[in-house]
């Protein structure tokens, strides 16, 4: 792992994010006119992958608050049993931080850490097992979340793995 560095913030694109999941946006979507032509449906922007271990899809709202700048990255998390999608409910830009896994699949590979600038009309769906930083907003903002609930009796930690470093590995300067 390299020493502390400043992460470059790159635009969120489908190609740039592809190894981590799906960018949810209208651009390039299949369009269907419905409801007697009064509604435009941007069809199947992402799939929800939550069936592992008897999981079921749920929708939640997360209310994000900004962290002080510069943002220090010392923690990442992943969800091994399902995807997790974030779609902003207001038109505010936000940040997405992801990393590939290390060689033995036990922790993030911080050398591959990436930070994406998402527009307020873009969401992401993290693929199962993708290391990502918790929600990073630049101003208070709500998100619609599609993710997995386990069967009755399953502990929350079954679908959440966290990795903490003793010291920050990178910073994001806004």
In which residue ranges do the predicted regions lie?
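Ligand-binding loop in jelly-roll beta-barrel domains
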Residues: 129-144
């Amino acid at each position: 792992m390299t020493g502390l560095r400043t992460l470059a913030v790159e635009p969120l694109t489908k190609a740039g994010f592809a190894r981590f999941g799906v960018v949810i946006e209208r651009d390039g979507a299949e369009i269907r006119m419905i409801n007697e032509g009064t509604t435009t449906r941007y069809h199947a922007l992402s799939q929800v992958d939550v069936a592992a271990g008897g999981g079921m899809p749920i929708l939640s709202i997360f209310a994000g608050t900004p962290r002080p700048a510069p943002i220090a990255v010392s923690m990442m998390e992943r969800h091994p049993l399902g995807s997790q999608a974030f779609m902003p409910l207001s038109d505010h830009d936000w940040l997405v931080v992801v990393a590939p896994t290390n060689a033995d699949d036990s922790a993030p590979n911080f050398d591959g850490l990436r930070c994406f600038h998402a527009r307020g009309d873009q969401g992401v769906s993290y693929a199962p097992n993708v290391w990502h930083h918790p929600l990073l907003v630049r101003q208070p903002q709500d998100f619609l979340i599609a993710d997995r609930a386990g069967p009755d009796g399953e502990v929350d930690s079954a679908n959440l793995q966290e990795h903490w470093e003793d010291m920050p590995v990178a910073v994001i300067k806004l």
